[in-house]
Regions:
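Transmembrane helical elements of multi-pass membrane transporters/channels
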Residues: 10-29, 129, 140, 163, ...
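Helix-terminus/linker motif at the lipid-water interface of multi-pass membrane proteins
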Residues: 20, 24-42, 110-117, 173-184, ...
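N-terminal transmembrane alpha-helices
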Residues: 3-31, 35-36, 52-64, 68, ...
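Small-residue-rich hydrophobic transmembrane alpha-helices
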Residues: 41-104, 140-151, 155-156, 256, ...
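Residue-level hotspots within pore-lining transmembrane alpha-helices
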Residues: 17, 21, 25, 54-58, ...
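Short alpha-helical transmembrane segments in multi-pass integral membrane proteins
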Residues: 1-15, 69-133, 181-239, 295-360, ...
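Small-residue hotspots at the loop-to-helix junctions and early N-terminal turns
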Residues: 38-49, 123, 127, 190, ...
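Short runs within selected transmembrane alpha-helices of multi-pass transporters and secretion channels
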Residues: 62, 130-148, 156-164, 189-205, ...
Length: 436
């Protein structure tokens, strides 16, 4: 098992660092917007939850490339892996168009979702700027899943970190109106995000086209052309993963509508804790991605024993991460709210959300580990049903029950998350047990 621990960490740590870079960026966005205006923080909270639903759903779709390239890499078929990247760029672009159509419909109905009227003027322009960045997110995801699947995880790590540094600099310039730029507030945060996402895609294209380590993959990318069976396989693998991750995120994003009924302070507090929650989620997902990569590698070699050992090692490491991250956040609990806003009311409300946050950490890590194990072995169709039961049949009704029927307010809405995530983890573990 020790070899599996080392391998998972060597692959997973660069992914975790890249993911943490994304969350540091989210921290920076939230802190810089929050200190500019609590009202803008509330608007950003609502818009980010909707746009992040599309981004995470799209990211899930791009994960369909992982078992394909991972298995090809395990068999040494580099040209075919390059062809798979080409096909993934097409399917990801088409997925972006589909999601943007839905987002456009939502944009024209923002005023009908029961949100505070004073926030709509901030929501609409910020929404459209982030809307424009979605195609670049999907193109980046295709390149990232490809390089991660051939174990070059440091490539995406460095590109992500570079893009995030540019984004933070852009936030400073556009939110506060520095270096001759107009003071744009929350819209400036969106402009900075859009520019950084475009730049990251350009960097990835240059690296893929110029680096010698991708030479064999470039040959397949340009010479093997389009493959209809491969396009269908990417769709058949990516769609269930997209729906599973989308339903999980939707349980959070739809909760934001209920939170909006509680007012601006509740929305701002929810955004602060969502940012903290995203940090732990992304770290767990970095390790989960390593589990998916290693299971797809061994699955391509028909090595059942090492698939199982990899998944068990992943669960052990996941529990260690939960203890370390949960303990750190507990020690810093009295300072978290002040990092993001000057409002003492928001800071005190944030403290009430820490209990459900700590409770659901194990369930979150468990479902991430086994979801990625199932993706690695390409057993993805059951994920849709599991996600529907866990997040729509269990989580959302429990959130409404605790938050409004029983009268626990924002904390009640958050109490639903432990129920949904833990039930998802148990069902995914049960499904993986059948692997032979």
């Amino acid at each position: 098992m020790s070899q599996h621990y080392r391998t998972l960490l060597s692959i997973g740590i660069p992914i975790m660092i890249g993911q943490m870079g994304m969350i540091v960026l989210s921290f920076a966005d939230t802190m810089m917007v929050g200190h500019h205006s609590t009202t803008e923080l509330g608007a950003a909270s609502f818009v980010n939850n909707i746009i992040n639903l599309a981004i995470i759903t799209g990211t899930g779709f791009s994960y369909g490339l992982t078992p394909v390239v991972g298995a090809l890499f395990g068999r040494g078929e580099q040209a075919e892996a390059g062809q798979a990247l080409r096909c993934s760029l097409l399917t990801n672009t088409l997925a972006a168009v589909a999601m943007m159509t839905v987002l456009l419909v939502l944009y024209f109905n923002l005023g009908n979702l029961g949100q505070p009227v004073e926030l709509l003027g901030y929501m609409r322009p910020y929404y459209m700027v982030l809307f424009a960045s979605l195609p670049f997110v999907m193109l980046f995801n295709a390149f990232k899943q490809f390089t991660d699947s051939i174990t070059l995880t440091r490539t995406s790590m460095w590109i992500l970190l570079s893009g995030n540094l540019l984004n933070i600099l852009g936030n400073y310039i556009f939110i506060y109106g520095k270096m001759g730029a107009p003071e744009m507030g929350v819209v400036g945060a969106g402009v900075s995000t859009l520019l950084s996402r475009i730049i990251m895609v350009v960097i990835f294209i240059v690296v893929f086209m110029r680096s010698r380590r991708f030479a064999a993959y470039r040959e397949g990318f340009f010479k093997l052309g389009w493959s209809r069976p491969l396009l269908r396989r990417l769709n058949s693998l990516g769609t269930p993963i997209a729906l599973e991750m989308g339903m999980e995120t939707a349980s959070f994003s739809l909760s934001i509508i209920m939170v909006g009924w509680l007012g601006t302070i509740a929305l701002a507090s929810h955004q602060v804790m969502t940012t903290i929650s995203q940090f732990t989620f992304m770290v767990y997902y970095g390790l989960g991605a390593a589990v998916a990569l290693r299971t797809s590698y061994f699955h391509g070699q028909r090595d059942v024993q090492n698939v199982r050992h990899t998944v068990t090692a992943g669960l052990h490491l996941m529990v260690m991460l939960e203890v370390v991250l949960g303990g750190t956040i507990f020690l810093l609990r009295n300072h978290i709210g002040a990092w993001f806003t000057d409002s003492t009311e928001v800071s005190s409300t944030v403290l009430t959300l820490l209990l459900p946050f700590f409770i659901y950490q194990f369930g979150d890590g468990m479902q991430i580990n086994y979801a990625n194990a199932l993706r690695g072995i390409a057993d993805v169709k059951p994920l849709m049903l599991i996600a529907f039961i866990a997040f729509f049949v269990i989580s959302l009704p429990v959130g409404y029950l605790c938050g409004f029927v029983l009268g626990y307010g924002l904390m009640g809405v958050w109490m639903a998350f432990p129920f949904g995530l833990t039930s998802a983890g148990v069902m995914m573990w049960w499904r993986f047990r059948r692997y032979k």
